[in-house]
Each structure stands twice: as C-alpha cells, then as structure tokens.
Curated annotation (Swiss-Prot):
UniProt biased composition (Basic and acidic residues): 71-80
Subcellular location as annotated: Membrane
Organism, as annotated: Dictyostelium discoideum (Social amoeba)
Residues exposed to the Cytoplasmic side: 1-256
Name listed for the protein in its UniProt record: Chloride channel protein D
Length: 1000
C-alpha cells in the first residue's frame, strides 16, 4: 500500500485500480485540508487524483457522486473530531461499515469497496502559517501569536468538550425518549382500554336510550291533542254571518257570570274540605290523648288503627273507583292546558273521588296537603260550569252551547285552577299569578281579569263561611303574628341567601327522591292494584310509628314562658294554665300553677272556681284577650307531659299540618318571646323526617298535594337556621327564627316548583307584611337558580314520567339546527277535496286525528285540513252532506256540541261496498285556514307556532305547495327532537350535508 495517499487501495501502476475518493471530486472538495506544513504533499496528491478523475469521470453517474460525497463528508466529520478519547472508535466503526458494503455496478463499471487505514488519520492542523513566530516579529506580535495559539487550542478543547457533551446529551435524550415511550405505552394501554370501554358503554347507553324512547313513544301515542284552533270553514262562516250581532256582548257577559258561579262553588268545596279535615283531625287527637292518659301502648294502637284506616280508605277510592283522582292532579291540569287531552281528568266522578280521598288522606296524618287536589278540583269545576252538561248525570243546559269548544273550555279551566289555589291560601292575587306562572300555557289580558275575579269570589266565599263557623280565615296559614314584626336587619340578608341556597339544594334532593320513587312505582307497584293499596298502608304505618315514638326521646318543657299575661278580663267556663291575672272576674274557672297578681283576693271575683298550687302575690299584668291565651295553650302538645308542660317534638310531629306550620312560623311579640319554644334538635329531626316521607308519599295512590309539605319542610329548616344565628349572635341583635322560617318555606317551595312571583305574592298575602318583599324575592330567586342548575322542576318531570305530551316555553337547542323535513312524517295520509266514501277507510286503517286535504292525487296541492271527528260526524249524517245549500248540511255549532258530548266510533258504521264509489265533497267542511310551512322551515320556528297558537297539525309543503309531510305536536317534543338530532349526529354530517338530509 502506498504511503503517498492513505485512501489509495491498490498498486498505482495497476490499470484496473479503482478510482480513489479524490479522483471523484475536485480539489476544493477533497479531504486535504491540513495546515501549511502538509500543503505541498496534499497538492501533489490532488494533482494525481485530478488526472485520474479526468480519465474516469465520464463513466460515473451523478447519483454515485452524490453518494460518495455524503461518505466523504461523514469522513471529514470523523477526521475533524478525531482524538485519543474515543472518537477514533466511532471513526473505525464507520470505516469498517464502509468496507462491508457490497459491490455496485453502474454503467458497466465495477466499484470496489474502499478500504481505508485508520492508522493514517491525523488530526487536523490547528495552526496556520500566520500563527508561526518569526524572527522579525515584534514582541507584541509574538505575544499576540502565542496567545492566539493558546486561544485556538482552548477553543478547540472547548469545542471538543461541547461536542462530547452534545453527543452524550443526544444519547441520553434518546434513551430518555425511548424510556418515556415505553412508559407511555405501558400507561396508555389501560387508558386506551378505559376509552374503549367508555365508547362501548356510550354506544350501549345510546341503544338503551333509543329503546326507552321507542317505549315512551308508544305510551305517548295514547294521548290525543286538543283543537285550540277554531275551524273556519264555509259552514262556520255562515253561522257567524247569521249571528254576527250577538257575538261579542252576549258571550262576554256569560263568561263573567260563569266565573262568578265557579268562584262560589270552589269556595264552598274548599270550606267543606277544610272543615272535614279539621274536625276529623281534632277528634282523632282528642281520642288518642284521652287513651294516652290510660296507657301508652294502647294509645299507640289506637293512633295506628285510626291513621291506617283513614289512609287505606282513601287509597281504595283512588285505586278502584277512579284512578285518575290519585296524586295532586297538577301535572294533568298542566298537560291539559298545554293542549293534551287526558281521559277522565275533568270528569265529575273524578271531582267527588278527589274530594273524599283528599279529606281521608290528609286527616290520616300522611305527609301531604290539600292544595294540590284543590287545584285539580277547581279545574274540574271550571270545565263543568263552562259546558253546563254532565255525562255522568245526563243533563245539558242549552244556553252555554257557544262555550263548548276546547279554546273556551281551556280559559275556564285556567280560572278554576287559580281559584283553587286562592281558596286554599286565602290569596286571590297569588292564585291568579300561580295560574299564570305554573299551570297555564296560553294567557290573555281578558283572561287575567276573569281569573282574578273568580279567585276573589272563591276567597271571599271561603272566608265568609269560616267566619260564620267561628274558624279563622285561611285554609293553609293561620295568624302567625308576622304582621306585627318590625323590619329585618340589613346583615340578615346573608343568612337569608344561605337559606335560599339550602332551599335550592333541598328542593333538588326532594325532586330527585320523588322521581326515583315514581320510577320504582311505575315498574314494580302500579301494575298491581292491591300493591298500590298495600304501599299506602306501609307508608302510613311507618310514619305513625315515628310520629308516636319519636317524641318520647325528648324532655318536657314548661309552657309558662310562652303564655301571655292576662289582666282586666272576664273569663267564663274555661281552664287556664300558667297565667298571670289581676282585677279579673273568673267564673267556673280552673287554675293550675297560676299567679294572681296586684292586690288581694278581694280585687278579683271567683265563682265556682278551683285553685290548685297557685300563688297570690303582688305583681303586675297587662290587658290581654283570654281567647288568645286559650289558643296559645292549644298549640302546645302535652303528649306524655304533666299539666302546664309540653313536648316540643310532639308539638311539631304529633299534630295536623296546620298546627305544625303555625308553630314553625310563630314569631316574637311584645308579650311573649317564642324563640326557644322549639329547640334545635326537634327542628332538625322533624325536617329530615318530613323531607323523606313527603318525597316518598307524593305520587302514591291517594289524592294529596305537595305544596303544604314544601312549606312545612322549608319552615322547619329555615327556623333551624334562625336558631343557629340566634345562638351565634346571642342577645346582641334581635333575631326572630319565625322570620327565617318564612324565608325557608319560600325557598324550599321555590326550589321544588321553581315558582317565583306567585310564590312571593302568596307569602306576602298570608303574612300581611310588604316590608319582607325584598328578602323573600332574593331568597326565592337564589333557590330557583341553584335548583335549575341541578334538576328540572318536579311537575315537569312528573309530566314526562306520565308520558304527557307537553311543549315547554323555550325550545331545545337541537331544534335550531334542524329543519321541518328532518322531523316530519314523510308519507302523510291525505284526502282529496272530492273524495269517495271508500277512501274514508283510512279512519279504520290509521289512528291519525287529522288529514290534509289536497286538490287531487296527482298534484297534491294542499287546500285545507279535516279532523277525524269531523269525518265521523259526516259519516253519521252522511245523507245531509249531499244536500247542497241546505240547512241540514254540516253544522259547526252542532259539531262542537256533539264533540263535547259523544261521537260515534268508526266501527259503528257499516256501509254497503256498492256505495264506496260515492263521491263526498269535503270543501265545505275542511278547515280553510290551515297553517303550512316549507320543508326548509326551521324546527325552532315551527315550535313557536305550535306553542303560541295551540296548533295540532301542520302540513309541510315544497315551494309549489305540494304536500311533502306533516308535523304534529308529538314530533316537537324535546325528547323527540333530541333523539332525531342524535341520529343525525351519529351520521357525522357537516352542515352542508345536514341541510340536504331529507331531500328527495
């Protein structure tokens, strides 16, 4: 091997030698880059290589040049980084790798592997000729060159060190990256499994949701919708023309007269229900207390038997006699006023069953109230009085025929529902607003005045009857003394807001429990009637045990601090306990632990009176009504305590709901401080007990409501918060737990029902203090906001669980992305203007209640719409249809009257097949004012048309008015649109593809 060129791998004189690396490249690209000491030798080698390169350059392709160039550049890198610390190993490995390359053939020239001797490598010369120190150099130049060499050497070492560090860092980073990849793969495997499981569960959930929706859809189909849209056809126009002068005045006067009688009748029913409940409850507790004086266990058996007997009888009525009477009836009334026809909801049979079941259930001690049934009863009264007819009793009054349509009936039902609330709470304005805010879906100014008038009459009737019977006014809330209370402190807004938050959370919990219980009943209990009765028996049995035995764990308290002093009074035939008297005349009185103050016995007159353990001392007293003292004494429950003492838990739980609310809302007065009359633990346990039992009881097989339990639960936790604040602040400020109880009652009721304005007005009316308007509104709004963030309102969820089609006030977000062609029925059943009798077989073949009427089968241009009920009447009076210009032709007023009474079934008609070809003209009967929309019409806007106008059917047409489909109320339900959007979203379409879904 020649020593002249370290890269030469053969005899230089051999004609078949392979070209060297330097022969393939120009001198500027060679590896000879040594210092000036080796320049001459390298130049000679380069010249020789250039000569050889010129001879063979034409036979080497540019591709191989590029490849060799890459190799040379790599060798340059290795040569420049050569040192004794390990880079030589890398260079040697590279050379051995190059020696292992296979032969390559290019254009007939065999390229031999290049063999390189690594021992000939020398490090690159660090210094150039300019760095040499010459004799003629000045001292400064010598110093500069010396430092320059040193600097270059230092830079070289630094560069070499940096390259080593960089190389090692690269290796470390690569190792770390590989390690992280290994860790990530190990970690992501379970994550991927979890993601896959989640995706699989999501698919299973979607399949389950779809199955549930199809099941719910079948349940929804059993309900029909009401016709709130007036049918304007030729027959109706003729009737309007004939009676045009009587249209406005007569009908409006009749509406006010009907509203008057509705209010009176609802007030009478409210009074009798209240009187029955009060008397049954009063005598029940008196009897149990009398037995309690004899034996505790015997008193429990008596209390248990009485409660279970009353509750079971109530359940038997609601299960076997009229099942529609069970529950509060509010979801059914809301659904009806939204446009859904619910069978048996407004029948007189339902009213009497509701009344009796409500009286028995509330008297039994169930955690339920009477206001919900009163709303339902008021709605039934509104329906019955407006129609002036009854199928059960078989009578009709002809002069109210003009109100026998769904639209007028809806208005009277709305007024009746509000009057039921007004009579229950003695709040006419609150009842009107409740009807507007909660149950009604369609409202007008004229309806507002009539509804308010009906509520005033119902409240006045109720109060007059109660005042004549010696009772206090109001069915739900009695005189609590709140009206005499001074205004609140500004810092109390903070605990009021806390009460609002707790009301929202508690209301959401109450709703969730009731929904879960309702689902359980629907799947396990409601299918068997006997189980429904057994459930009521178990509920009242367990509740009775807790009501009776829980007070035994609480100690007795003295009633003296909570009884006002009595002076300058005359009392006759009474029994007084722990009273203070002076200058009084007492006749036939009995005194226990009493104080007679201010003077000697000669200052007072006693006739046939007995004094036990009493003290006659000097003292002072104030004038006070003795009847009020008797009332105060009746609010305390002795239970197992001695005379003059009471049990705080029995005062709450061993009492009627009226007495419980009265004690909870009791505020301080000038004579008595009621802060400590009910302690913290009784408040807490009573709230928990009532919350869970009321949530479970609501919806069972008895006629009960939930509004009163909401008030009781809210008042209990509100008073509890007030007591906590009182114990924290002490006597520094005036804290009245009774005010906190009012705020709690409003908050919890708002958290469950989401009522705001009507609830605030009702509580303002029953407390008679406008100064609490601001804190009440803040508390109620806070409760509503918190509950809205957690769950839907209770009555809306109950309607969904009962499969009642209901259009909410606001449309869902999915509706804004869809068009009518996405949700419409694609193949609507239609009739022609002039059709045949045989084509009316669609009444038997389908369950549709509305049919678009087109001009003919070819063009299918929409001309109107006809209802199933109209076709049934045509079939019934088919002979009249063919008499043109006759009075016997289809009559609109007769149709509406027939509709509210009884129409024949399609199976009642049997026509001769020979008559099937007979032509029927529907142009005089069909509704000419049918509303149609284009296939591209937004679903959200179609929803607004249905919601505001009370539509039942909406044909869908193209730009030429050709029938393409039909939309009904059930197609616009929130769940329906969500399911349809989910199906479209599952297709993963863009907005452009989504627009064209449904096109032909």
């Amino acid at each position: 091997m020649s020593s002249g060129n370290p890269f030469d791998n053969g005899n230089p004189n051999d004609g078949n030698k392979s070209p060297s690396i330097d022969e393939l490249y120009s001198p500027s690209e060679s590896l000879a880059r040594d210092g000036d000491d080796n320049n001459n030798n390298n130049n000679n080698n380069n010249n020789n290589n250039n000569n050889n390169n010129n001879n063979n350059n034409s036979s080497v392709s540019e591709k191989k040049k590029s490849k060799k160039k890459v190799r040379i550049q790599e060798e340059e890198r290795l040569t420049e980084s050569y040192d004794d610390d390990g880079d030589d190993e890398e260079r040697r490995a590279y050379i051995e790798n190059e020696e292992g390359e296979e032969e390559e053939t290019e254009d007939g020239i065999i390229l031999q592997p290049i063999v390189r001797d690594h021992s000939t490598y020398r490090p690159k010369n660090l210094y150039g000729s300019s760095d040499d120190i010459r004799e003629g150099d000045s001292f400064g130049a010598k110093v500069s060159k010396t430092f320059g060499k040193t600097n270059k050497k230092i830079k070289q070492k630094i560069g070499e060190s940096n390259k080593k560090i960089e190389t090692r860092v690269k290796h470390s980073n690569k190792a770390i990256e590989e390690g992280w990849k290994t860790i990530a793969q190990t970690t992501m495997k379970p994550v991927d499994n979890i993601r896959e499981q989640h995706h699989r569960r999501a698919e299973q959930h979607e399949v389950a949701e779809r199955a549930v929706w199809f099941k719910d859809k079948l349940q929804i189909q059993k309900y029909e919708c009401l016709d709130y849209v007036t049918i304007y056809n030729k027959a109706h126009r003729n009737e309007l023309y004939k009676n045009f002068s009587k249209l406005a005045s007569d009908h409006e006067v009749l509406r006010w007269i009907v509203s008057l009688f509705m209010g009176i009748f609802i007030g009478v029913i409210a009074y009798f229900s209240h009187a029955c409940v009060s008397n049954i409850t009063k005598y029940k507790f008196k009897f149990v207390e009398a037995v309690l004086e004899l034996d505790l266990f015997l008193a429990f058996l008596t209390y248990f038997l009485l409660n279970t007997l009353l509750a079971t009888c109530s359940s038997l009525l609601a299960v076997y006699y009229e099942p529609t009477a069970a529950g509060s009836g509010i979801p059914e009334v809301k659904g009806y006023l939204n446009g859904t026809k619910i069978p048996h909801t407004l029948k007189m049979k339902t009213l009497w069953t509701k009344f009796l079941s409500m009286v028995l259930a509330v008297s039994s001690g169930l955690q339920a109230g009477s206001e919900g049934p009163m709303i339902h009863i008021g709605a039934i009264v509104g329906n019955g009085f407006s129609q002036a007819q009854s199928k059960e009793f078989g009578f009709k009054i002809p002069f109210l025929r003009s109100f026998r349509n769904d639209k007028d009936k809806r208005d009277f039902v709305t007024s009746g529902a509000g009057a039921g609330v007004a009579a229950a709470f003695s709040a006419p304005l609150g009842g009107t607003l409740f009807s507007l805010e909660e149950v009604s879906s369609f409202w007008s100014i004229a309806l507002t005045w009539r509804a308010f008038f009906c509520c005033m009459v119902a409240t006045y009737t109720m109060n007059v009857l109660q005042s004549n019977s010696g009772s206090l006014t109001g069915l739900i809330i009695f005189n609590t003394g709140i009206g005499d209370k001074e205004s609140y402190n500004w810092f109390e807004i903070i605990p009021f807001l806390l009460i609002g938050v707790l009301g929202g959370l508690g209301g959401a919990l109450f709703t969730w429990i009731n929904v879960k219980v309702t689902e359980f009943r629907r799947e396990k209990i409601n299918k068997i009637k006997s189980l429904r009765v057994l459930e009521v028996f178990l509920i009242i049995g367990l509740s009775t045990c807790i009501q009776f035995f829980l007070p035994l764990f609480f100690s007795c308290q003295n009633t003296a601090p909570f009884i006002p002093s009595v002076g300058n009074s005359t009392l006759t035939d009474v029994t007084l306990t722990n009273g203070a008297f002076y200058n009084s005349t007492i006749i036939n009185g009995t005194f226990y632990n009493s104080t007679i103050a201010n003077g000697t016995i000669y200052n007072s007159k006693f006739y046939n009176s007995s004094i036990y353990n009493s003290t006659i001392t000097n003292g002072t007293g104030v004038s006070y009504d003795p009847a009020e003292t008797l009332k105060e004494l009746s609010e305390f429950k002795r239970f197992n305590c001695k005379e003059g003492w009471y049990n705080p838990m029995a005062t709450l739980i061993f009492a009627s709901y009226e007495e419980s609310i009265t004690n909870l809302l009791k505020v301080n007065s000038n004579n008595v401080t009621n802060t400590e009359r009910l302690g913290l633990w009784p408040m807490f346990l009573f709230c928990i007990f009532y919350l869970f039992f009321a949530a479970y009881t609501a919806g069972c097989a008895v006629a009960t409501g939930t509004l009163v339990p909401m008030l009781v639960i809210g008042a209990s936790y509100g008073r509890f918060v007030g007591l906590v604040v009182y114990h924290i602040l002490g006597d520094k400020v005036s804290i009245d737990p009774g005010i906190y109880a009012v705020m709690g009652a409003a908050a919890f009721m708002g958290g469950v029902s989401r009522l705001t304005i009507s609830l605030t007005v009702i509580l303002i009316e029953i407390t008679d203090r406008l100064k609490y308007l601001l804190p009440l509104m803040l508390t109620v709004m806070t409760a509503k906001w918190v509950a809205d963030a957690l769950i839907h309102p209770l009555f809306d969820l109950l309607m969904q669980m009962k499969y009642i089609p209901y259009l909410e006030l606001d449309q869902s977000k999915e509706m804004k992305l869809m068009m009518c062609k996405h949700i419409m029925a694609k193949k609507p059943v239609y009739l022609a203007e002039k059709d045949t009798l045989g084509n009316l077989r669609v009444l038997k073949e389908t369950r549709h209640n509305g049919f678009p009427v087109v001009n003919n089968d070819e063009e299918k241009l929409v001309k109107g719409l006809i209802l199933r009920t109209q076709l049934l009447m045509i079939l019934e009076r088919i002979s009249d249809v063919y008499i043109p210009n006759s009075e016997a032709i289809y009559s609109h007023i007769e149709y509406t009257t027939k509709l509210t009474w009884k129409l024949p079934s399609v199976n009642d008609f049997n026509f001769d097949p020979a008559d099937y070809s007979q032509e029927i003209d529907l142009s005089d009967v069909m509704n000419l004012t049918v509303i149609t929309v284009n296939v591209e019409f937004a679903v959200s806007e179609a929803f607004q048309l249905f919601r505001t106008m009370g539509l039942r059917h909406m044909p869908v047409v193209n730009e030429n008015n050709k029938l393409k489909g039909i939309i009904t109320k059930k197609d616009l339900l929130e769940k329906t649109c969500e399911q349809r959007y989910r199906e479209l979203n599952h297709m993963k379409l863009g907005i452009d593809q989504l627009i064209h879904v449904g096109d032909e």
